[in-house]
């Protein structure tokens, strides 16, 4: 499914968290969203999920405005993973996945949970309470939760934060493979520049609620004459600071 963001803005108390952003994610494409804390990434994701009402602008999914979708329909096609969203601490990993699976109307739920536990290496702690897990384990559970309904659109916020390098690399490979097999459209918000270069077809850079550059990693790097995406991002952000 394709997503088009058109002139999207959100104000809180007369201050813009997001201001007039425009971009498109094609079907089975991954777009990376980069920016410092407070740049508007989380607000943008919240609007795309239908959790935050835009001040102005439109979100178009497969040529239909998000406002025309019933909540159940949105739940069936879209999901979200973030290590910063707390899971019920007193419930086990399995119980958490069961709850979310029922919420999303997943058929053959037991099989789906077993499948994700195998794919994301959750089996060793599937019956542990989430409050007893490490931050890296919680992150993998959050990713499993986001895939429970096999969404066509996946919004990922720092999916490999707090993961050991080997596990982080495994998760990145898994996301790549899952996208290819299931034709999933992905928005990836990350501070990991190498991760964005590896996983994303194109990149959006944000600061203070605005898009300051976008294109493929190669296009952006070449445009600013730097060696890699991290150097390029730092140059652009500092240039914006000097202008401000």
Per-region residue spans from a language model:
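Conserved ABC transporter NBD signature motif
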Residues: 57-67, 73-74
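Conserved ABC ATPase "signature" region
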Residues: 79, 98, 102-125
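Conserved ABC ATPase signature
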Residues: 129-133
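Conserved catalytic motifs of ABC-family nucleotide-binding domains
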Residues: 150
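Catalytic Walker B motif of ABC-type/P-loop ATPase nucleotide-binding domains
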Residues: 154-158
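Helical segment within the ABC ATPase nucleotide-binding domain
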Residues: 169-181
């Amino acid at each position: 499914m394709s997503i088009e963001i058109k002139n999207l803005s959100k104000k809180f108390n007369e201050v813009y968290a997001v201001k007039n952003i425009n971009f498109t994610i094609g079907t089975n494409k991954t777009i990376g969203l980069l920016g410092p804390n407070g740049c508007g990434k989380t607000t943008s994701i919240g609007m795309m999920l239908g959790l935050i009402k835009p001040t102005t602008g439109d979100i178009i999914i497969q040529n239909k405005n998000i406002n025309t979708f019933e909540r159940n329909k949105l739940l069936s096609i879209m999901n979200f993973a973030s290590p910063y969203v707390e899971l019920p601490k007193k419930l086990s990993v399995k119980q958490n996945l069961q709850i979310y699976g029922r919420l999303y109307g997943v058929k053959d739920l037991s099989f789906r949970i077993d499948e994700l536990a195998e794919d994301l290496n959750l089996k060793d702690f599937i019956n542990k309470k989430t409050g007893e897990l490490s931050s890296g384990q919680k992150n993998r559970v959050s990713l499993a939760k986001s895939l429970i309904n096999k969404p066509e659109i996946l919004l990922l916020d720092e999916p490999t934060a707090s993961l050991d390098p080997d596990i982080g690399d495994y998760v990145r490979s898994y996301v790549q493979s899952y996208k290819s097999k299931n034709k999933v459209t992905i928005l990836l918000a990350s501070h990991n520049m190498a991760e964005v270069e590896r996983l994303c077809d194109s990149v959006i850079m944000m600061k203070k609620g605005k898009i300051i550059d976008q294109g493929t990693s190669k296009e952006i790097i070449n445009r600013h004459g730097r060696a890699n995406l991290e150097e390029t991002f730092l140059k652009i952000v500092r240039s914006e600071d000097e202008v401000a």
